[in-house]
Amino acid sequence: MREKLTVIKVGGKIVEEEATLLQLLNDFAAISGHKVLVHGGGRSATKIAAQLGIESKMVNGRRITDAETLKVVTMVYGGLVNKNIVAGLQARGVNALGLTGADMNVIRSVKRPVKEVDYGFVGDVEKVDASLLADLIHKGVVPVMAPLTHDGQGNMLNTNADTIAGETAKALSVLFDVTLVYCFEKKGVLRDENDDDSVIPEITRAEFEQYVADGVIQGGMIPKLENSFEAINRSEEHTSELQSHA
C-alpha cells in the first residue's frame, strides 16, 4: 500500500489577509502525514505593482507578464508571500521549505508560445522532479511552492499556481496515493457570484465549457477549473481524489 500525500493549493485572500492566513497555517499544520502546499499571491502582486507604477493586465483570469511584471511577481511570490507562509509554518512546528521551480530545478517550464494572446514571461510546465520532492518529503520536509518556474536558460517564468498544484500532484501520484485539494475563497463554484448559496455541487467538462460560454463562470475561476479537469484527465491512473474546499 502506497503512502498518502495531500497537496493543498491556496490563493487570494486566504494567504494575503492576516486572519485567513492564520487560519490556513493552523489548519495546514494540523494535517497529518505527508503534505505539500502550493500558493498564489496575485492580489499582493497587483498591489505592489501599482505602488511601483506598473499596470497589471489580465486576460481570462490570467496575468500578462511583461519584463517589469516578472520582477514584481518574482519578488512577491518567491519572497514576500512564500516566506511569510514558511515562517508561519515553522512557528507551528512544520519543517517547511519554500521553493520556486528554479530551486534545485524542481519544475522546468517552457515559455508559452504566442497564439491569440501574448502572455509574456509565462511558463507552461514541462517537467516536475517528483523524485526530488519525494526525497525531501521522506526527510520530513514540507515543500511550500511558489507559482514561479524557470526555463533552464536562466529565465524565471510566471506560472499559474493551480497548474503547479495539478502538475505536482500528477507527478507525485506515481509515488504516492495523492489527494489534491483546491481551496477557494467562496463556498465553491457559484451560478451567481453574488449568492454564496448558488453552489454548483458537481460539474462536468461539457457543463464547464457551457457555463464559460454563458458568462456564468469567468475570470480567475476559469483557469482553476481548467486545471482541475486537466489534473483529473492526466492523473486518472494514480490520483485518488480531487476535491475543492472553501
Q: What are these regions, as identified by a protein language model?
A:
Residues 1-240:
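Nucleotide/pyrophosphate-binding catalytic subdomain
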Residues 241-246:
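Positively charged, low-complexity/disordered segments
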